[in-house]
Regions:
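Conserved ABC ATPase "signature" region
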Residues: 49, 53-76
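ABC ATPase "signature
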Residues: 164-165
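Conserved catalytic motifs of ABC-family nucleotide-binding domains
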Residues: 101
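Conserved ABC ATPase signature
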Residues: 80-84
Length: 205
């Protein structure tokens, strides 16, 4: 986030020093948090205008109109975000992450509450972004989507990376699904945790 300055060393993202040029870096990054919603008392257009001005987007009015149209939100242009459906609010959040066409995206359950049409539409936009040199960090429990979209992935449980690599590399056979991989790794981790917990109880007794 850039809120804490490093006591030593430097962090560069996209070749930009995060401490020296935080605004330049943020202009190249988009983010959709899992549980965030757009501000209640702004309309979708007002929120996108706000985000666009923060990022110094040129020709902002046309960009806002483009993404409002792209997400089918034209009829909601004068509606407060608090009065939108969950799916519509998610579209606004995605539009705020896409509007400046970033080189780096962080997405946490980005397709939550979206209907299948917009899931496919967004997925294709993201795949095109990667083809054009962009990078996406995607967090999701929808393993089928992750398998279709990601060329590398990490399986994390309780903050610990259990495995990382390509989808093919994580599988023990061609017949194994990503769900099978997850259950194999996380299930083993849970069983191990339960075993250690039981041993601890036994030792106390």
């Amino acid at each position: 986030t850039g809120q804490l300055r490093p006591s030593i060393g430097a962090v560069e993202v996209l070749g930009i020093n995060a401490a020296i040029s935080p605004q330049k870096l943020k202009a190249n990054i988009g983010i959709v948090p899992e549980s965030e919603s757009p501000p209640s008392y702004l309309t979708p257009g007002e929120f996108l205008q706000f985000v666009g001005k923060l990022r110094g987007i040129e020709d902002l009015d046309s960009k806002v109109k483009y993404w409002m149209d792209w997400f089918g939100l034209q009829e909601k242009s004068d509606t407060m975000c608090k009065d939108l459906s969950k799916g519509q609010r998610q579209k606004v959040m995605l539009a705020s992450a896409f509007i400046h066409e970033p080189k780096l995206l962080f997405l946490d359950e980005p397709f939550a509450n979206l209907d299948p049409i917009y899931q496919r539409k967004c997925r294709q936009w993201l795949l095109d972004m990667v083809k054009n040199g962009g990078t996406i960090f995607l967090c999701s429990h929808v393993l089928e989507m992750a398998e279709r979209m990601c060329n590398r992935m990490a399986i994390i449980n309780n903050g610990k990376v259990l495995a990382a690599g390509t989808v093919k590399g994580l599988k023990e056979s061609d017949d194994e699904t990503l769900e099978d991989v997850f259950i194999r790794l996380v299930g083993h981790s849970i069983e191990e945790a339960e075993r250690l917990s039981d041993e601890g109880v036994a030792e106390e007794e």
